[in-house]
Every structure is written in structure tokens, then in C-alpha cells.
Regions:
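Metal-dependent catalytic cores of enzymes that make or break cyclic nucleotides
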Residues: 3-447
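Short alpha-helical "packing" element that flanks the helix-turn-helix/winged-helix DNA-binding module
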Residues: 34, 157, 188, 454-457, ...
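Base-recognition residues in the alpha-helical recognition helix of bacterial helix-turn-helix
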Residues: 62, 313, 483-490, 502
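Short, Lys/Arg-enriched C-terminal cap helix and immediately downstream tail that follows
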Residues: 346, 490-505
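Helix-turn-helix DNA-binding segment
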Residues: 443-482, 491, 507, 511-515
Length: 515
């Protein structure tokens, strides 16, 4: 194999930003345009280059925590991507607009008709749950930035993403200049670019001016509106990538092999945190695919490609709502997730080989796979190994109403698929041999000073369990569970389930698909 090009940190961050665009229902390149615009406004306002760089990263990653606790949004509102699109069109501080939004979406995640109205208590409970999710988004974005090696200022800024100039924001209800300037800038720039996607310029100006002094810093509003025509110039994602990723920042660095692995883990966790049902899935596929490569005696460079392909194989799911009760149409859209992943990764030359590999991970030798219906001669050894590893791992996880198969049952299913001509027999043999060697069911070591009981509770919490459910599962009182959770949060230095789940993913504490 030809050695791949070096990967720069900002290329990874750019890929994350593009994936976020999918997840929040915005045009691909929205985050890149916001980064360019935020940096330009910071300079226009006389900021030094350090603050301009912070504004760039805030524009790029402001919504990067969006997948945290998506299961809560799914349960309440159904399609979370459609919900995010609609939230972007209203004034969240206006109770009338919020009530109309909630009524139009609530119950969509459940069977039966949506309610036409409900009482204050129900509305309050729904909004309380939504606000907890927003808290999680802020903390998750900050933690992802930390793992990507971005500065403490960038981490702090991302933790303030949902704050408002008038103090009515969250998580800390900061007021005025207590909110970092890059946050104030990127918030207005983001909103202008979103509104510009469906409103004429005059209406964008009216909307933004109506929030001046309330949600937005008036000085920032003035600076942004003075450059609004430039900010709203349409730019396709290729041009936005060239400008935002290739032409920017002096603090960009090339990643070592170890740093690239960590960066790929960040992208994997961004996807897997979307649902307790898949938490840890990408890391498990990665470990199994790499081990299968060892059995198959592929080169060290090819094993690295398998390892990273396993981590990123489901990156395209950023564009797919769910996971619950997908309609037939959405199931068909879900079959495009390998395409979406390849599209994201091919922007960076050093990541393109990973994109090529994972584009084939649902293809089958007999042409029955997706998204291209490729056949055996077109499928590489590595794609065959990754396909078999993903199949085995998925079968051993609980998915929706399907219970997890035992390793023996999963092995039998893979052998049957091989005999039927769907999966490669040699790849299946390598994966099954590797599955007996990886030790993925080993006892979890204590970390961060957590007791064995606290690790149990952390795992249950990361799987989406409510306190009462965890209490029943572990035969504890709800109060005891709550006390343990507060102790866990203190030891981990987090405040939300999203932050705790990221910690558990990073430390390998989760067995995917366990309920």
C-alpha cells in the first residue's frame, strides 16, 4: 500500500464539523462558513489573532455536542434532525413559539396520535428534559475539544454555547460580557447563516435586530449586520473546506499515528453517543477488525487502516435520524450511511483511504449489500474483513426489539452467510478466530477512583437508564443511586449524562448493545 498523506488536526475537526452539519439538518459546509465568518467578525471588531482563532473554533464546533442524549429527544419528539431544523427557525425564549414547536413534535417518537394540548406540568417536564439535553450538549462539545487537543479557552467557550446576553441562557445563566466574546460572535454568525438559508436578507436583519440586547450582544449584532451580505454569500462545501481548513490557522498541526487514532476515536464517540444502544459499537468493531487483520496476516499499515475504518465505519449515521422506529423511507436513507461517511472523509487526502474502505462495509460478495450493490471481485480483502467484523459485533448487540445473539449463535450466522455466498469465508474465519482472542468481555478495571458499584451505575447511566430503572436493576433505592451518580460526576469532573457517557466510552467501560 502507498503510505497515506499526513492528516492535520484541522482536517479531523473539519470532518467533525461536516458531520455536525448533517446531524443538525443544515447544509453541508454550514459550520465551515460559520467559522470563516466568526473569524472575520472577530478581526473586524479589533480582536487579536488569538481571539480570532477562538472565534473560528467556536464557529466550527459550536454544535459538536449535539448528539449527546439524542435518545431523550427521540423519545419525546421523534426525528431529532427535523426538530433541530425547526428549533433554528424560532425564538426559543418566546413561550408561544416554543409551545407551538413542542405541540408539533411531541409524541412523534411514540405510537399513536400526537397530543393537541397538555397542561403546564407536562410542558414544564418536557422543557426540563430538553434543557438537560442542552446542558449535555455544552459539556460534550467541551470534552470533545479537550480530546482533540484544543486550548482551554476553546473548551470554556464551547461550554458556554447556549448562554444568552440577557442571562436567560444555560448552563450557567451568564450575563453580558461574562460570556466569552468568541461565543457571542459565533452565536450571531451561526444564526444569520441559518436564517439566510430560508429568508431574504431584509428578514434576516429584522430577526437578528429583534434579538439585540436580549439573546445577542448589541455590539456584535452591529458588526455582523455591517458584513451581512458577505456572510450570506452562497459557498459550496468544497469552497468552504478550502477556505476554512486549507487556508487557516497557524496553530494547525500534523498528527502522529497515535494522535490520529485518538482523533478517530473522538469521531467514533461523536456517533456512538447518539444512542445507548450503540455506545461503544465503533470501538468494538475497530478492535475486532484489527485483530482479524492480524489473523489474516495483513501488513501493519493495513491493520491501522482496519482499526481506523472500524472506528469510523458508522460516521455517516450523523445524517440519519433515529434510531427508533424508522419508516421504510428512512430505512432506505439509512442504507446511504456508508456513502455519507465516504463523502465526509474524502475531503482530507490522508483520510480518503479510510473513506474508500468504509464505503464498502455493507457490500456483499453476491451483490446483495449496499449502497452500490458491489460484488466479490470489486471488494478488497480489508473491506471483507471489516464487513465480517461489523456483522459479528452487531449480532452480539441488542438492537431495538432484537436480543443479542450469543457468540456461538453469531458465529453460526456468519458461517451460514459465508456458505450462502454473502460474506467471504476467509474473512469470517479470521473474524471468528479473532473474536476468541480479543478478550472483549474481560473484567473492567477500576478507573478515576470509582468503586465497582459506581462503575456498574456509570455503565447503566450511559446505557440511558433512568434513576428508578437503575435502582430496580441493581436492587438499590433511587436515593442511593442518585447519591452514587453525584459521586461519579464529582470524580469524573462532569455534570451531565453526556459527559459521563463520553468518559465511559473513552475508557472502554461500555459493552455495546447491553441492556
Amino acid at each position: 500500500m502507498t503510505p497515506p498523506a499526513a492528516v492535520r488536526r484541522n482536517e479531523i475537526i473539519g470532518v467533525l464539523s461536516l458531520a455536525v452539519d448533517f446531524a443538525i439538518g443544515q447544509a453541508v459546509g454550514y459550520g465551515l462558513r460559520s467559522a470563516i465568518g466568526s473569524m472575520a467578525i472577530a478581526r473586524e471588531m479589533g480582536c487579536d489573532e488569538a481571539l480570532a482563532a477562538e472565534s473560528y473554533y467556536q464557529g466550527l464546533l459550536q454544535a459538536s455536542g449535539c448528539n449527546a442524549e439524542t435518545d431523550v429527544l427521540n423519545a419525546l419528539f421523534g426525528d431529532e434532525i427535523l426538530l433541530r431544523q425547526d428549533v433554528a427557525r424560532i425564538e426559543r425564549a418566546d413561550p408561544t413559539q416554543m409551545l407551538a414547536l413542542v405541540l408539533s413534535h411531541v409524541g412523534a417518537g411514540r405510537e399513536g396520535p400526537a397530543p393537541q394540548a397538555f397542561g403546564d406540568a407536562a410542558y414544564s417536564a418536557i422543557m426540563g428534559a430538553a434543557n438537560r439535553v442542552f446542558h449535555s450538549h455544552c459539556e460534550t462539545a467541551s470534552k470533545l475539544a479537550e480530546r482533540l487537543g484544543l486550548s482551554s479557552n476553546v473548551q470554556r467557550n464551547l461550554a458556554q454555547t447556549h448562554e444568552r446576553w440577557d442571562g436567560a441562557g444555560l448552563p450557567d445563566k451568564l450575563v453580558g460580557t461574562a460570556i466569552a466574546l468568541p461565543v457571542r460572535i459565533a452565536t450571531v454568525v451561526h444564526h444569520c447563516i441559518r436564517l439566510g438559508g430560508f429568508l431574504p436578507v431584509e428578514d434576516v436583519i429584522t430577526r437578528v435586530q429583534s434579538r439585540s440586547g436580549a439573546a445577542y450582544d448589541p455590539a456584535v449584532v452591529d458588526a455582523v449586520l455591517s458584513r451581512l451580505p458577505v456572510l450570506l454569500i452562497d459557498m459550496d462545501d468544497a469552497a468552504a473546506w478550502e477556505s476554512a481548513i486549507c487556508d487557516f490557522p497557524p496553530d494547525d498541526v500534523s498528527l502522529s499515528e497515535a494522535e490520529l487514532d485518538i482523533a478517530c476515536e473522538v469521531l467514533a464517540d461523536f456517533i456512538d453517543i447518539k444512542s445507548p444502544a450503540i455506545a461503544g459499537h465503533s470501538r468494538a468493531v475497530s478492535a475486532l477488525a484489527e485483530a482479524a487483520g492480524q489473523v489474516a496476516k495483513v501488513t501493519a499499515q493495513e491493520r491501522a487502516l482496519l482499526r481506523r475504518g472500524g472506528l469510523l465505519h458508522d460516521l455517516g449515521y450523523a445524517a440519519i435520524p433515529g434510531p427508533q422506529r424508522l419508516s421504510h423511507a428512512m430505512s432506505e436513507q439509512g442504507r446511504l450511511h456508508p456513502y455519507y461517511a465516504q463523502r465526509l472523509l474524502h475531503r482530507a487526502p490522508g483520510l480518503a483511504p479510510i473513506g474508500t474502505l468504509i464505503a464498502e462495509h455493507h457490500e456483499r460478495l453476491d451483490g446483495s449489500g449496499f449502497h452500490r450493490a458491489s460484488r466479490g471481485p470489486d471488494l478488497s480483502t480489508l473491506s471483507r474483513l471489516l464487513s465480517a467484523a461489523d456483522c459479528y459485533q452487531t449480532l452480539t448487540e441488542t438492537r431495538g426489539r432484537r436480543e443479542a445473539l450469543t457468540p456461538k449463535q453469531a458465529a453460526q450466522t456468519l458461517r451460514e452467510d459465508s456458505r450462502a455466498g454473502s460474506l467471504c469465508g476467509q474473512a469470517v474465519a479470521a473474524v471468528l478466530e479473532a473474536a476468541g482472542q480479543t478478550g472483549r468481555r474481560k473484567k473492567v478495571a477500576h478507573v478515576a477512583g470509582l468503586t465497582a458499584r459506581e462503575i456498574e451505575i456509570l455503565q447503566a447511566l450511559a446505557r440511558g437508564g433512568a434513576n428508578k430503572y437503575i435502582a430496580r436493576e441493581l436492587e438499590l433505592s433511587p436515593k442511593t443511586v442518585d447519591n452514587h451518580i453525584q459521586s461519579i460526576y464529582a470524580k469524573l469532573g462532569v455534570k451531565t449524562r453526556g459527559g459521563a457517557t463520553l468518559f465511559a466510552l473513552e475508557r472502554g467501560l461500555l459493552q455495546p448493545g447491553k441492556t
